[in-house]
Regions:
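N-terminal amphipathic alpha-helical interaction or autoinhibitory segments
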Residues: 1-24
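Short, solvent-exposed alpha-helical surface patches in well-structured domains
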Residues: 5-8, 18, 44, 55-56, ...
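Residues that form generic nucleotide/phosphate-binding pockets
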Residues: 9, 22, 44, 48, ...
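Positively biased amphipathic helices and basic secretion/translocation or surface-docking motifs
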Residues: 28-64
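A residue-level detector for the "anchor" residue at the start of short, highly conserved motifs
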Residues: 49-67, 76-362
Length: 362
């Protein structure tokens, strides 16, 4: 009887339009409206009524909307299946040699070295842009809280980022930098570094700039300096080019730290927790920015670490006696690794073999 009442009720044009509008209004997936078939929905509805057996009878308008609601549910579930909402989304595997940018919402974007793109915040607003090997963040965005991005550069590559305050940071291979999308007035300008980077800090007397590392912090007002803080190294080195910086370890205050001047390298011994300083040729520590490899009084073990990062290749020292041997060498203009290895072979009699994408030093 319910079926007969519904069919009779739907024959009226106004009732039919009312039924159709009810389903569409309550069907929350607007994108599906182009595929919505009212006649098919009516057929499903009538079939459902035929299967249902009731001992009591409700008012006809209540039944109409009750069944319409059931159709809505069926349509919604079917649409969600079409979208894949009930299937497991395949995990996207990012190649290990990719330059990546982790956004505030946890999403990770892959940056092409010759690409151009916009950087968006969680609200879809543009906060910066990429042009080739450089990210540039805007300073005219309105933000009430600190929001961070993390730029990660793999072995074998280098990249640059210009922060919202105008500070320029050059990231060496195997480096990660976490920084605010925009620095907010009243707060210190803080970034977090692992690896190696050169900082050209925009001067701001009222907002000190702090580079936080695992065991060491560097605080400046505006200056140029290089920081090397690779986890596999025994020391964290800060080489000052211009201005002045203060170094202090975690748990210490700024006044308990060490102040260094241009031409000085401050080094934290991670095992001892002590900071020492010495005069150095600063060009040795910034040569990587030009693609050069410069080794001065460096152990072969540390040279190999730099070569692995520079070329993104696994290098195994078979002859362990070489580890502590000291070498001096200079290689200009992004030299091929074969040239570097041949030079060591010619000058020092060190041979090598290549097998399974690894270099063995004999």
């Amino acid at each position: 009887l319910e079926r007969e009442e519904l069919e009779l009720w739907l024959k009226n044009h106004n009732n039919y339009e009312l039924f159709k509008g009810y389903v569409k209004i309550n069907f929350l997936i607007d994108l599906d409206m182009d595929m919505f078939d009212v006649d098919d929905s009516k057929k499903q509805l009538l079939e459902l009524i035929d299967k249902e057996k009731k001992e009591y009878r409700l008012r006809k308008y209540v039944n109409v909307f009750k069944y319409a609601a059931v159709v809505i549910i069926f349509l919604g579930i079917g649409y969600l299946y079409q979208l894949g909402c009930f299937t497991k989304t395949p995990e996207v595997i990012i190649p290990s040699d990719s330059i990546t940018l982790k956004l505030e919402n946890g999403n990770v974007e892959v940056l092409s070295e010759d690409g151009t793109s916009q950087i968006l915040d969680a609200n879809g607003s543009v906060v910066g842009s990429q042009k080739g090997k450089q990210l540039v963040y805007d300073n005219d965005n309105v933000m009430e809280k600190l929001v961070y991005n993390t730029l990660t550069v793999p072995y074998g590559k280098r990249f640059e980022v210009k922060l919202s305050d105008g500070t320029k940071v050059y990231l060496n291979a195997g480096t990660s930098l976490k920084y605010p999308v925009k620095f907010i007035g009243g707060n210190k300008r803080q970034v977090f570094l692992t690896g190696e980077a050169f900082f050209d800090v925009a001067h701001d007397v009222t907002h000190p700039f702090i580079v936080n590392m695992e065991n060491l912090n560097v605080e400046v007002l505006g200056t140029e300096f290089n920081v090397s803080a690779y986890s596999e190294d025994l020391t964290t080195d800060v080489v000052l080019i211009k201005g002045s910086v203060n170094l202090y370890t975690n748990g210490k205050t700024l006044n308990e730290g060490l102040r260094i001047e241009p031409g000085i390298k401050g080094a934290l011994n991670r095992k001892l927790g002590s900071i020492t300083s010495e005069a150095v040729d600063t060009s040795i520590y910034t040569s990587w920015m030009e693609g050069d490899l410069v080794f001065r009084n460096m152990s072969f073990e540390n040279i190999v670490k730099k070569l692995e990062r520079y070329y993104n290749m696994k290098i195994i020292i078979v002859n362990k006696q070489l580890n502590n041997e000291i070498f001096n060498a200079t290689f200009k203009d992004e030299p091929p690794i074969q040239d570097v290895l041949n030079s060591f072979g010619k000058s020092y009699g060190i041979s090598h073999t290549i097998k399974d994408n690894a270099i063995f030093i004999n």
